[in-house]
Amino acid sequence: MKNLFLFALCTFSVSSFALTPRIETASNSDSFISFRTANDAIYCSGDIPGLTPKVECVTTIKGKPILPRPKDCEFEWGELFSVGATGKASLVCASDTPAVPDSQILKDDETIKGKGWQCTASGDSLTCSNQEKHGFKISQAKQKLF
């Protein structure tokens, strides 16, 4: 009976581990994280060495940007979202995007963590937030800052 209990416990532990979404963490100051959603619609980069810890994600939106283009923005607008370890999320006026073609794939219901932020894939969308609960939820069809 004792052996059966241990077998059942080990089987449960292994199956529970297999069902747990992968969580990765940036652990040192030189960590650079790049990832994309499984449908290749959203690309992100985070914790770039030498810059303030943050994650930036880009997607091609369908429709108008959620915020009007600032008058001083001469580059791309409405498709690049950013959130740092603290503070509010924002749209970024940028001439360059964080798209890294060979970045790791963040599968549905998986979460990746950086320095003070985390992102979770869900269906065709991605939600990224910081410790203060500020962030963004984006897909090609809808975008939201919170």
Each PLM stretch: what is its role?
Residues 29-41, 110-118:
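Extracellular glycan-recognition/adhesion modules and their associated mucin-like linkers
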Residues 13-15:
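N-terminal signal peptide c-region/cleavage motif recognized by signal peptidases
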Residues 1-4:
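Positively charged n-region of N-terminal signal peptides that target proteins for export
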Residues 49-63, 123-130:
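Short, well-ordered strand-loop elements centered on a beta-strand within folded domains, enriched
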Residues 93-131:
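Acidic, glycine-rich flexible loop segments
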Residues 19-26, 54-106, 138-146:
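A low-complexity, Ser/Thr/Gly/Pro-enriched, surface-exposed linker/loop concept
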Residues 123-146:
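C-terminal or internal capping secondary-structure element at the end of a domain, subdomain, or sheet
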